[in-house]
């Protein structure tokens, strides 16, 4: 089983950026669609229809969808080594009357008649430059959180209170899944954005239902509800039932113990690796992050430019070393530049830069890694040979798995990428092993990933 192009899109380390205010309106980023009060998608569409009528409103929205992000933007991203984008959308974005029936968006269904068609054209456009696309349900039924970016300004998160809302969101996920199968550059579907904290049982049930309607090859990205470690453990415990990826958002300007800390202290804390060291090799991405700090933080330094660069570099080091990738929030703003929220600003100011892939001249397994393999294999055999077992072991599968990890690591590099989700890749590889001892192959691969990580091979900034 070789590495195909779809595998490369899905399993590589994601150097990403969010395309905010495109299919899910956010006034502070782009106010083109707004004619009255409010800042959410619902207020944008209702105001536009009220001011211009349904047909002209549809023209306005379609003009925005077609022009906000174009091939020149994808070219800019590729030039700056972006290989994936995260596109926020809502259940209203799918151009399906049944999906908006009985919702606040039902009166405006005609505005969204062609939205999915345009979205698919843009997915294809991104694919022409080898950029992957993560489709993110910012807007779910009832609201996944109390913020306007969930689609309305109701201030309510009622998704968790009604089974109907959860089931309808699953139907929306299923419908979207049925429309994107032809695009090899779709890297996943995120089924909810920033769910509120504490809804563990509701979310676990919802995530499993959503997983069941998404094609097995495609990851289901899940919001962590501000409890990263809980959902990383949950995904690790459920990896045999399908490919999940935890979406964690990392901001230092909205709250938490570091919200008002000096930039130097925040950077030092990041550099310790305390926050993400426990998640290494797990299926997790930083779905949103920025270089924004509070005014109180910035007031505590006179070295603004240096601290800004140090902060950006420290974040990238953590997110790309310990996670499967990250997506900066957000790509651009309608009116000028958006400061430390603006990808173009921080790239052009050299605050952050995604790293080029490491060289691939040396394809032979390093002697130190071979030594680790042989030592681990000996320990593996000794341990399991002392145990009662119902069938003969196949210890050679352990070595086969270890060697396969190295070969796959090199193959990703040869395609200009680093592997981002090694545990999930191991699960995929296991499907080719028809043996009751396939677990030995799995353990060999995962042990190899662990040692590759320890030696720095999985860190794009500190690669040997």
Curated annotation (Swiss-Prot):
Belongs to the glycosyl hydrolase 5 (cellulase A) family. It catalyses: Successive hydrolysis of beta-D-glucose units from the non-reducing ends of (1->3)-beta-D-glucans, releasing alpha-glucose. This is Glucan 1,3-beta-glucosidase 3. Signal peptide: none annotated. InterPro entries: Glycoside_hydrolase_SF (IPR017853), Glycosyl_hydrolase_5 (IPR050386). One of its GO terms (cellular component) is mating projection actin fusion focus. Keywords: Cell wall biogenesis/degradation, Glycosidase, Hydrolase. One of its GO terms (biological process) is fungal-type cell wall disassembly involved in conjugation with cellular fusion. PANTHER family: GLUCAN 1,3-BETA-GLUCOSIDASE 3 (PTHR31297:SF43), GLUCAN ENDO-1,6-BETA-GLUCOSIDASE B (PTHR31297). The keyword Cell wall biogenesis/degradation applies. The keyword Nucleotide-binding does not apply. It comes from Schizosaccharomyces pombe (strain 972 / ATCC 24843). Its EC number is 3.2.1.58. One of its GO terms (molecular function) is glucan exo-1,3-beta-glucosidase activity. The gene is exg3.
